[in-house]
Amino acid sequence: MNLSFDVITKEGDKIVVSLNSFYPYISELIGNTFPQLEIVEITIVRESGEKPIKMEVFGRIAQVLISIAQDNPDTILYYFCDMTEGLPHQRSGRTLSCQEYRNNLFKHLFQRYSSESTEHWTDIEIEMRSTQLEQTLYAHFLLRDKHLPLVDILRNEVLNNFKSISDQK
């Protein structure tokens, strides 16, 4: 899957949401068990605008993503919470890292909008502690119940990939 859509806010900000096949390969075990499976990475990029993006905009994005996933029954959505600065991350009097802010936002949005879906979805959160970056990084897989047997494999692939990248630095 390779598609994207633009979201233009009332304030004129432009956000581009892309969905692209995440792994050009899927581990042999996953491929043998679920030959039609596609893991799709979600990328959200703000192309213009400087004011904080309202929750209703993120809500619209989440609704579209859930709709796309529902239309593609052999799809697992993947999201890595990036470290781009520029977002407000104050919550209850404490400062959150960009990663933690995005992690909480992603969890909240998909819990809310996946509950409106006709299917049951599970959000698998993966925490990766980086001593080099001195912070915790987060990734998520959003998957259907039929894909739950893959959780450990997916988690291990992300953690092993993260470890190999961390070891190179």
Language-model regions: role of each:
Residues 1-169:
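Non-catalytic substrate-recognition and accessory regions of acyl/acetyltransferase enzymes
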